[in-house]
A protein has these predicted regions:
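N-terminal amphipathic alpha-helix/helix-capping segment at the start of soluble metabolic enzymes
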Residues: 2-28, 35-36, 182
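Alpha/beta catalytic cores of nucleotide-metabolism and tRNA/nucleoside-modifying enzymes
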Residues: 2-9, 185-200, 205-247
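Glycine/Thr-rich beta-alpha phosphate-binding loop at enzyme active sites
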Residues: 55-63, 141, 149-188, 194-198, ...
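Hydrophobic faces of well-ordered beta-strands that scaffold small-molecule active sites
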Residues: 20-26, 49-51, 77-82, 100-104, ...
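Catalytic cores of alpha/beta
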Residues: 36-41, 86-96, 142-155, 203-222
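Alpha-helix-loop-beta-strand connector modules within alpha/beta enzyme cores
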Residues: 62-81, 118-138, 176-198, 202, ...
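N-terminal active-site wall of soluble small-molecule enzyme domains
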Residues: 50-125
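Glycine-rich phosphate-binding active-site loops on the catalytic face of alpha/beta enzymes
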Residues: 102-111, 159-171, 215-236
């Protein structure tokens, strides 16, 4: 499913990524059913899998390490979000394990500029060849959006968190929509709107999806809501229908 990304440059990869508005939080599923999930995703033409790597320090939860990236089907796009206190070795290990997108938290990434430049020199294997590793930054709910500006030339993904990592506190719908609109305005002012994919992550539900997409968001990250009631294919279909109707 990731063959179309082979041989594309960064701008072309971002443009193609925007055709896939869902990044599916695979850790919300059952690891032993990956083969079954892959069949559903292939039928729905949804190649993007999201993995949250948490170390129990930046946020109180532990999840998985970079080893898990290599266990995912080769045909999928691995969208990796690092929430760790010492990101540099995890960044390197994630790329080595096959990550196609690596998103860093701006709040706890020393030498962020250096890491983004290093990522900008990396490629990831896809069916039929390679693609550039796409670089992302993620912002917690209270992080000023101005943190985007110093590295806006060095990223392809900007991700807004609707929740505080590892905690249940979530932005109100109005606050989330306002924040998304502010990022869109910031990207437009910098002439980077087309070159950057805007994502939202964090306990999203189907009811708020139309307004989120209408605000200018390109991709939503969802895990538990898509795996709810053991109905992955049906849930994804409903989300995609809602997303396409809102555009």
């Amino acid at each position: 499913m990731n063959r179309p990304f082979s041989g594309l440059n960064r701008t072309e990869c971002v443009s193609l990524m925007k055709h896939y508005p869902l990044s599916i939080g695979i850790l919300a599923g059952q690891w032993l059913r990956l083969g079954e999930y892959q069949q559903d995703l292939r039928a729905l033409e949804q190649p993007v899998l999201h993995l949250d790597l948490m170390d129990g320090h930046f946020c109180p939860q532990f999840t998985v390490g970079p080893w898990a990236i290599a266990q995912l089907p080769q045909q999928m796009i691995k969208d990796v979000h690092l929430m760790v206190d010492n990101p540099w070795p995890v960044v390197q290990a994630s790329v080595k394990a096959g990550a196609h997108c690596v998103t860093l938290q701006v709040e706890n990434t020393p030498h962020l500029h250096h890491m983004l430049h290093w990522l900008g020199e990396q490629n990831a294997e896809v069916s039929g060849g390679t693609m550039p590793v796409l670089r992302g930054i993620s912002l917690c709910p209270a992080t000023p959006l101005e943190h985007i500006l110093p590295i806006i030339e060095d990223v392809e993904i900007v991700q807004i968190l609707a929740v505080n990592p590892g905690y249940g506190s979530k932005l109100s719908r109005s606050a989330l929509l306002r924040r998304a609109a502010q990022v869109v305005a910031l990207l437009n002012a910098a002439g980077k709107r087309d070159a950057i994919l805007l994502a939202v992550d964090g306990s999203l539900n189907l009811e708020e999806l139309p307004e989120i997409i209408a605000s200018g968001v390109d991709r939503v990250v969802s895990g538990s809501a898509l795996f709810r009631n053991d109905a992955l294919a049906d849930n994804i279909s409903r989300w995609l229908t809602t997303i396409h109707s809102a555009k």
